[in-house]
Each structure stands twice: as C-alpha cells, then as structure tokens.
C-alpha cells in the first residue's frame, strides 16, 4: 500500500473474515485498531499482537486512522462509519482490503457456495509442507497454526473469496477455485440462482491470461457456465470427464481415502483426517492447485496426511461416556446434508442426534423447503429458534414451523426447543453410549455442544 497509510481501523474486527486480514496487516507492520460489540478469543488474540481493540461501536474509536474497513454486516448508520465520513476518512469493504493484499502477491482465491474454508485450509497445509509458504487468510481457525491467518514469506496469497455480497469481484486472483454454485444469500441476489451464476462467471473471467481456474465438474451449475468461461481452466470431480478424478473412495470414521488421477494417469493414494464425500471434492480442488504450482505429488500426499482440520468443521468437542459430540458450521441445506451424510458414511452403526439452529430469517425463508428434507440422515433432530444475525423476523421463517413441516414429511423424532439454553439438559436425558451428537449452525449453537460435554463429564 502507498506509504502514507499507517493506521487501519476495522469495524467488526472480531469477525472471522475481518480478523484474518487485520492479523496479516499487523504482521506487515501496520498499526491496526478495531471495534466489536463484544470481546472474544479473536479480539484478545489481536490485542496481544498489538491491535487497539474497542468494545462497542462509537465515534471515539476512530483515533488518527487513515482508512476504515467494514464487513457487509456493517451499515451506513454505524457511528464509526458516520464519523469516518465526517472526517473524510475512506471507508472500504473488507474485500477491497483483501484485494490490496492480493495485489502484492500472486493470489489464489477459493470461492464457492460451500466448502471454501475447508478447501482453503487443506490447500494451506499442502502448500506449507511443499515449502511455498503462502500468506493465508481463512474463514476458520486452522488447527495446525491455531489461527485463521498467517503472513508467509512466499510469493502467493491464499484466501477465501466470499460471494455473499458480490464483493469478491474486486479480487483479481491468479488462480481461482470454484467448489460449487448454489442458491444462498438471496437477500443480495434478488435474481436468484441465475444472477449467482452470472456473478461467478465474472469472477472466473477475472483470472489473467497466464492464470488458471479450477472448477468442480460434478456441480451442475458449474457445468452450466463452462461455455461462458473464457480463461484456462482445469476440472475436478468423480466424473470420468474430469481432469482431476478420484476413484476407490473409502470412508472409515474420520479417515477419508481415495486414488487420485490426472488426465487418465494414476497419481497415487490420498488420505486425510476429515470425513465426508464432499471433502473428497474439496481435496481434489487442492490437488489441482498444487499441480498447477508444480508441487510434487509426494508433497501433496504429505500435506494431506498432516492436515489437522479446521475449526467448526466436523470438530470433536469431546467423547464423554462413549458419546461423541461434534460441532459443524453447516447452516445451508446442502451443507447439512453433506455433514450428516459424512457421519452416516463414517459411523454407519451409530445413532446420530442432530441439533440445528437456523441462521438468518431470510435464509430460513428462502430455502425453507430444502431445510425440510435436509435432515433425513439424522435419527433424532432437535431444533432451536433462529439466530437472527441482526435481521428482523420474517413471517413463517421459524424453527417451530420448520419442525412441524419436517414431521409432516415423514421424519419421526423431531423436537423444537425454543430456548437453546435448555438443550443440553434435554440431551442429557436422551443420549446413550455410542451416540453421535452433532450441533449444526453458523450462530451460537456450538455452545450447547460444549455445555453437553461438561454435563456428561460431571455425571459420569
């Protein structure tokens, strides 16, 4: 960045996407300040690294700042945004700051409706073990490094590209990965899936002539846009038509294995510790990126074998009394189906107890019918009220109505518990040895999983 920029302020610095960029900037030597509505382990970490953290949004938080960075959740009436404009301090979206960091490196952007965080994390493990040492910005905590960002000494920047508000179009990556295209964030994409597909086409075609797009051929919406892709691309999938292909896929508990092929040539075996057929696809995207960067296949294998997972993606919270408690960020019907299918594949003999907190009224409303049929792999389902994420209620978009419709569509053991604080005690009365309890949602439901672990340990 131009030398006169010294201090950068983040409104909503505790967010997983904002904090990663803030940490990289701190490590680059910039002064960083930020505010959030409440403190967290993220804000505490940033404070230890030297950031000035304010709790609550107020004009006084802007002290000698040169630019203000905001997320899509921050509105124009935020007091810090109002003050910045009064002081004629530039206010930019998070994606624009990420684009500035990417401009200084060769960018690898992982996009797609689902699987971005896991794919980016896997790629970070592979490239790190290959000696490429990328700068990374991830939307989840990479277990191997204990954080969601790292300043590397290499020439690449590896980051998630968030499509939720279309701002990923400001990025200009050298390598662009698209894992899938699905209907989500319909509050922004009023034109539905066709507008979403159009936006991804624009994103892919921003790749330079010397770059590469990596696209999942198994995804029908990606197949639909292929004729409109103008840049060089590589495909991956289970399909025999894919450039990177997986065969002989095996699932054994947390371990997933498959044989990787490139354009008909057998590369070798891949194995990693993360369950689910969807993660086979995520892994193949990483293989494609690594091959494009001339990473030896032996280093790819090593990177996968050392992959330690990422926070809130099928994360074990504890196994007291023979009951496995897992937390997963899945909050879209497709993600829920994939997570529950992963549990069913890896542990076919176990009873699966799913605990779901819908995230956002708009998503619950727009995808209501898909949510109704998303839980068939769960033996027991508990729903709690919607995590609003700052939204106002939408008529009919309630967990109570969702539970009723799920029952009407043939699922038998469904319970609505509006107060999530009561869920751990309810679970204590129904779970038994051998069960797998999975908390699902992008809100606060992970806390109930942790509370259940504590209760089970106390009563063991």
Swiss-Prot record:
It is found in: Cytoplasm. InterPro entries: Mur-like_cat_sf, Mur_ligase_C, Mur_ligase_C_dom_sf, Mur_ligase_cen, Mur_ligase_N, MurCDEF_pg_biosynth, UDP-N-AcMur_Ala_ligase_MurC. Its EC number is 6.3.2.8. Pathway: Cell wall biogenesis; peptidoglycan biosynthesis. Its main location: cytoplasm. Keywords: ATP-binding, Cell cycle, Cell division, Cell shape, Cell wall biogenesis/degradation, Cytoplasm, Ligase, Nucleotide-binding, Peptidoglycan synthesis. It comes from the Bacteria. GO terms for molecular function: ATP binding; UDP-N-acetylmuramate-L-alanine ligase activity. Gene3D superfamilies: Mur ligase, C-terminal domain, Mur-like, catalytic domain, NAD(P)-binding Rossmann-like Domain. One of its GO terms (cellular component) is cytoplasm. Belongs to the MurCDEF family. This is UDP-N-acetylmuramate--L-alanine ligase. It comes from Pelobacter propionicus (strain DSM 2379 / NBRC 103807 / OttBd1). The lineage of its organism: Bacteria, Pseudomonadati, Thermodesulfobacteriota, Desulfuromonadia, Desulfuromonadales.
């Amino acid at each position: 960045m131009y030398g006169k920029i010294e201090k950068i302020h983040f409104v909503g610095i505790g967010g997983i996407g904002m904090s990663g960029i803030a940490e990289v900037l701190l490590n680059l030597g910039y002064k960083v300040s930020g505010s959030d509505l409440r403190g967290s382990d993220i804000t505490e970490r940033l404070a230890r690294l030297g950031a000035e953290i304010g709790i609550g949004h107020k004009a006084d938080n802007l002290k000698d700042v040169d630019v203000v960075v905001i997320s899509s959740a921050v509105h124009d009436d935020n007091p810090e945004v109002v003050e910045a404009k009064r002081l004629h301090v530039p206010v930019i979206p998070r994606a624009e700051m990420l684009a500035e960091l990417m401009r200084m490196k060769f960018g690898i952007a992982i996009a797609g409706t689902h699987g971005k965080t896991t794919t980016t994390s896997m790629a970070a493990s592979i490239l790190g073990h290959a000696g490429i040492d990328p700068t990374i910005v991830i939307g989840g905590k990479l277990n191997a490094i204990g954080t969601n960002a790292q300043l590397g000494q290499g020439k690449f920047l590896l980051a998630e590209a968030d499509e939720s508000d279309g701002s990923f179009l400001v990025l200009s990556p050298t390598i662009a990965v698209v894992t899938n295209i699905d209907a989500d964030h319909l509050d922004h994409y009023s034109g539905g899936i066709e507008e979403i597909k159009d936006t991804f086409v624009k994103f892919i075609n921003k790749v330079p002539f010397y770059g590469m797009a990596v696209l999942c051929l198994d995804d029908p919406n990606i197949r639909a846009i292929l004729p409109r892709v103008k840049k060089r691309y590589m495909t991956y999938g289970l399909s025999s038509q894919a450039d990177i292909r997986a065969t002989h896929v095996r699932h054994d508990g947390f371990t997933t294995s498959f044989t990787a092929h490139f354009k008909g040539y057998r590369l070798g075996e891949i194995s990693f510790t993360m369950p689910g057929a969807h993660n086979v696809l995520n892994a193949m995207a990483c293989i494609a990126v690594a091959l494009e960067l001339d990473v030896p296949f032996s280093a790819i294998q090593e990177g996968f074998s050392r992959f330690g997972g990422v926070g809130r993606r099928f994360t074990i919270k504890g196994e007291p009394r023979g009951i496995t408690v897992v937390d997963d960020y899945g909050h879209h019907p497709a993600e829920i189906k994939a997570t529950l299918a992963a549990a069913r594949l890896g542990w076919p003999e176990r009873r699966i107890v799913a605990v779901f907190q819908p995230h956002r009224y708009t998503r619950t409303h727009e995808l209501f019918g898909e949510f109704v049929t998303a839980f068939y792999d769960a033996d027991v389902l508990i729903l709690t009220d919607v995590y609003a994420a700052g939204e106002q209620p939408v008529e009919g978009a309630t967990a109570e109505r969702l539970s009723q419709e799920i029952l009407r569509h043939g699922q038998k053991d469904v319970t609505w518990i509006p107060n999530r604080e009561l869920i751990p005690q309810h679970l204590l009365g129904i779970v038994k040895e051998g069960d797998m309890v999975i908390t699902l949602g992008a809100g606060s439901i992970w806390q109930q999983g942790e509370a259940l672990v504590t209760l089970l340990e106390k009563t063991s």
